[in-house]
Amino acid sequence: MLVGGLHKPMTRILTSAAALLAGLIFAGAAASAHDLAEPTVFRSRHGVLDLLMIARAKPISTITYAPPTGSPMNPTGWVYEICRRPASGNTCPADAAVADYGGVRLALQKGDTLKIRLVNQLPQLDAAKVNHNADPGQANLFRNPTNLHTHGLIVEPRAPTLKDQTFGDYVFVQIFNSANGMPVPQTTHQHGSNKMDYADYRIDIPWNHPSGQFWFHPHIHGISLNQVSQGLAGIISVGEVSDYAHGDARDTPFPDASVRHLILKDLQVAPGGPVQFDSGPANVQPGEVINQQDPGFCAQFPADSSEVREGSCPGVDTSADGGSNFSGGKWFFTVNGRTFPKIKVTDSDGEVWRLTNASGSLSYNLQLTDDETQKPIIIQLISVDGVSVNLPQDTTMDTMVRLGGARFRVVPCPPLPTSRFHSKPVCVTQMVMMPSSRTEVFVTYRDPATGAIASPGRSASATFKMAGLTMGSGDQWPAVDLAKVHFHQHGWRNHIAYGLDIRGDALATMQPSGILDAKVPYASAAPLRDGCRPLPPGHRRRIFFGLADLTDDGTFGLGY
């Protein structure tokens, strides 16, 4: 059997030991300064994950910016300092705290309970840099209130009660840092209840919740963009990839040791001087982070071949067109908090990449480009926004292209024996990830001519990149190289012959016993208003979301 093929049964013990060793190296070895490390993981214990999470400012040690004048510096981001919750107090022990700009992963299982005390220690802001012209709720934005939202989880948006003072996934609460002053009353656009300094959350994960990847971030109307853009975001996993992704060779769950989590964030660092914000111009200091981001910070494409964009692009001057002068500034693009890291793919069966766009406003147009051929490498699509891809075997290519739309460039997979797969594999060469989106893909080296899984040469490599994206008449996002990928897959393949077999764990949500059919235990029907009557059996109510007043373009109404 050739290297790179499936192993024979008699070699199972040796190859399993090698795979175990590779998995231990992947999961536990310390990464070098330029190797991509996994996000720090906080796992539930005995069905509970109980954390203290402190939102605060911190210099980003993994990013160095050299201003036009002055010494190199680490720009200041906002991070979640996290530890397992101590018995008392709102501070983390110094030897137990994690405060990574790149983000952490909260690893949960179905049926778990997530408990978080969220403490606000964020700095006060300059109102001129956060206010929005047409936002009537901006009076308290400069005080930098925050809260927490577990994006994508199917959980209760529960408010506190007399018996239970904790919040569920409830976005209508504002947590203020008392050091920034007391919030003023608002007569219009009151966000919800106010809490000072901290709030306690208890989020119950249903036992029938689908496995997948989700994320958490602030959800304060009017300032969540600023807070996410400055770094406040992390990821959540429920269950394992192996719950819905199996190897096709022997129907074996894909090994969790070969699952890689990539959190994509970006940071605009200004050279100093006047900057155009929503409410008008304001001066910024050299090295200050622009968290009300400007899509025109740098040119969409390099000026010429001499401009190397490895993890960043240089600021440009658009003041002649009414923009800002960002010359000398830099727009950083990070993977797990690092700019242009190295990714070493060592498992012969390849890796599953779980990608999260944790940027505040940036949309990514992603490709994995073979460095030798300069052509995109085929990757298999596994999951989109926490929903595993499970298409019927008879799905046509035309249907898949239509389903992919402008988000995925769907291409034919290399020839596959249908008997090995429960669903139709979907292959892509390009994918657009808008803010908050998550995508899971199967990555392995492939023959450049056929696209089939193959054993790489000694120097096989690829570039994980943003190809540049134009949003119609809207924003233009730049082309930047995000990471260098090296393929070192020279052993026997244990699980994969042609691709991953996707079982579609998310389909169970639609079944009679699924989570979307479950009733909230304490919920009861609200009294009918005058003129309303119950719907007849089999009927559905349609609710229109849109503008309540078409003459006022600053108003957005829900439920009209």
Residue ranges and their predicted role:
Residues 43, 240-260, 505-523, 527:
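Low-complexity, Pro/Ser/Thr- and charge-rich linker/hinge segments at domain boundaries
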Residues 107, 205-208, 445:
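Short, flexible loop/turn segments at beta-strand junctions in immunoglobulin-like
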Residues 150-187, 268-271, 284-523:
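Histidine- and aromatic-rich segments of cupredoxin/plastocyanin-like copper-binding domains
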Residues 190-227:
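A conserved hydrophobic secondary-structure block that centers on an alpha-helix together
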Residues 16-27:
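Bacterial N-terminal signal peptides
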Residues 31-178, 183-190, 198-200, 279, ...:
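N-terminal, post-signal-peptide metal-ligating segments of extracellular/periplasmic oxidoreductases
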Residues 114-116, 190-202, 433-443:
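Short Pro-Gly-centered flexible turn/kink motifs
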Residues 1-13:
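N-terminal secretory signal peptides that target proteins for export/translocation
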